[in-house]
From Swiss-Prot:
Gene name, Swiss-Prot/TrEMBL: gatA
InterPro entries, alphabetized: Amidase, Amidase_CS, Amidase_dom, AS_sf, GatA
Superkingdom classification of source: Bacteria
Organism listed in the record: Bordetella pertussis (strain Tohama I / ATCC BAA-589 / NCTC 13251)
Entry protein name: Glutamyl-tRNA(Gln) amidotransferase subunit A
EC number: 6.3.5.7
Protein task: Allows the formation of correctly charged Gln-tRNA(Gln) through the transamidation of misacylated Glu-tRNA(Gln) in organisms which lack glutaminyl-tRNA synthetase. The reaction takes place in the presence of glutamine and ATP through an activated gamma-phospho-Glu-tRNA(Gln).
Length: 512
């Protein structure tokens, strides 16, 4: 049995900020409590790197800023970062032996912005190797265990982030979502998580997997907490070539333009102040087919019924290419991974084999030793579909299909519905090792999240119940919006969380 961290006694981020301002608790006390809780819950394997000296130094700086009246909006809030974000002073491995011992000389933009806001990092969180996986079993440093049932996976690839939030070791965590890697672990661990519109949160300093798909997003117990984080994380970044410049707001001294308050916050305020009467919730028939487990279907149906009680209207919509998102994604994402991971050759950086003959053997052995099986599998797929003889037949066809998938969503939003809702995952969390002999089974777990990623839309996961044989494995509701509609999604989630308590429930024990 492990103790919860001290921050849980004060509620969400807003309440915690108020407690810090009133000196009811100090940032150092919160940080030390979080470190103690993380150590006690080490059996979850959620954390990869912890440095108490760095954490407590940040906490002391937050306390000083609070005392001086110069504190940022997240001053003293204990968080942690997925190990896919580079961090100055902390090791960054992306869950891979290839980057064992790597220390970045700079911070990712997301890390930098959260630090500027005063957040205190407790460490780096476990993840699937190079963010490739749906169960956090592909980490070179061992699987993460789900706090609700330690025999179960937490989801992936941001499994360490979801597990740490679910176990209440931190108030919030960062994650990345390429094909569902924030939403899926959030659902399986019973926490809230959001993937923003592609390009609204900087990718600078995220170790790349699929550059046209990767997007950073936060995980936290509630949608209100997510808004607090997204308000800081969102904004144009000239260091990221994919960062969107269509932002409102004033440039700060570093030249960056923040759009969080003017966009996500404004959308949240506008949607939150309006009654739900007449809100059209699109329910895709393709999300409720034979592959959806009955316990997941029941929990999602109950959530939809709750929204109807709040005044929303349920309307059927069709996303006919839902299942085709799987082959499209597993052509495009591996192709981009093959290109992005080509740099890890042991020459300039990355693991280098101890024994080799010529240069070619050194590169071959270094990559064979440094990469895990799933990463190798995707590199091979990507290299194949980008080869001269198959580029048109596979890669270009997948890109055409990607456009058609995006058009399906736009047809739904154009005149049929305001938001789309459905399950995040077709099942509750599987047991660790269940899919070891069939790695493609994990690919199918993302059938409801991949289309959103290919289209670049915002979507989030909200806890909506439990399933499984023992009834203690969480289920998540997916809420999908049109481009830049994060504020509305968060407001709708908040309305739901005002009348339900799924997001307030935490696992009693994190014994492994």
């Amino acid at each position: 049995m492990t103790q919860s961290a001290l921050h849980t006694e004060f509620g969400g981020i807003a309440a915690l900020r108020d407690a810090l301002a009133r000196r009811q608790v100090s940032a150092v006390e919160l940080a030390q409590s979080g470190l103690d809780a993380a150590q006690a819950a080490s059996g979850l394997n959620a954390f990869l790197h912890i440095d108490p000296d760095l954490t407590l130094a940040q906490a002391r700086a937050a306390d000083a800023a609070l005392a001086a009246g110069t504190a940022g909006p997240l001053a003293g809030i204990p968080i942690a970062h997925k190990d896919a974000f580079v961090t100055r002073g902390w090791r960054t491995t992306a869950g891979s032996k290839m980057l064992a011992g790597y220390a970045s000389p700079f911070d990712a933009t997301v890390v930098e912005r959260l630090a500027e806001a005063g957040a205190v990092s407790l460490g780096k969180l476990n993840c699937d190797e190079f963010a490739m996986g749906s169960g956090n079993e592909n980490s070179a440093y061992g699987p993460v265990r789900n706090p609700w049932d330690t025999q179960a996976v937490p989801g992936g690839s941001s499994g360490g982030s979801a597990a740490a939030v679910a176990a209440r070791l931190v108030a919030a965590a960062t994650g990345t979502d390429t094909g569902g890697s924030v939403r899926q672990p959030a659902a399986l661990c019973g926490v809230s998580g959001i993937k923003p519109t592609y390009g609204t949160v900087s990718r600078y300093g995220i170790i790349a997997f699929g550059s046209s798909l990767d997007q950073a997003g936060p995980l936290a117990p509630s949608s209100r907490d997510l808004l607090e984080l997204l308000d800081v994380m969102t904004g144009f970044d000239p260091r990221d070539a994919t960062s969107l410049q269509a932002c409102d707001g004033q440039a700060n001294e570093s030249g960056r333009v923040r759009r969080g308050h003017d966009a996500a916050q404004a959308g949240y305020d506008a949607a939150g102040s309006q009654p739900l009467k007449g809100l059209r919730i699109g329910v895709p028939q393709e999300y409720f087919g034979a592959g959806l487990a009955p316990d997941v279907a029941a929990a999602v149906e109950a959530a939809l019924a709750q929204f109807e009680q709040l005044g929303a209207v349920r309307v059927p919509v069709s996303l006919p290419r839902t299942e085709l998102a799987i082959p499209a994604y597993y052509v495009i994402a591996p192709a981009e991974a093959s290109s992005n991971l080509a740099r890890y050759d042991g020459v300039r950086y990355g693991h280098r084999a101890a024994q080799y003959g010529d240069l070619n053997e050194m590169i071959s052995r270094s990559r064979a030793e440094g990469f895990g099986d799933e990463v190798k599998r995707r590199i091979l797929i990507g290299t194949y579909v980008l080869s001269h003889g198959y580029y048109d037949a596979y890669y270009l066809q997948a890109q055409r299909l990607r456009r058609l998938i995006a058009q399906d969503f736009q047809r739904a939003f154009a005149g049929q519905c305001d938001v789309i809702m459905g399950p995040v995952s077709p099942t509750v969390a599987k047991n660790i090792g269940d899919n070891r002999d069939d790695p493609t089974a994990d690919w199918l777990a993302d059938v409801y999240t991949l289309g959103v990623s290919l289209a670049g839309l915002p979507a989030m996961s909200v806890p909506c119940g439990f399933g499984g044989q023992d009834g203690r494995r969480p289920v998540g509701l997916q809420i999908i919006g049109n481009y830049f509609d994060e504020g509305r999604l968060l407001a709708l989630a908040d309305r739901y969380q005002q009348v339900t308590d799924w997001h307030q429930r935490a696992p009693v024990s994190q014994d492994a």
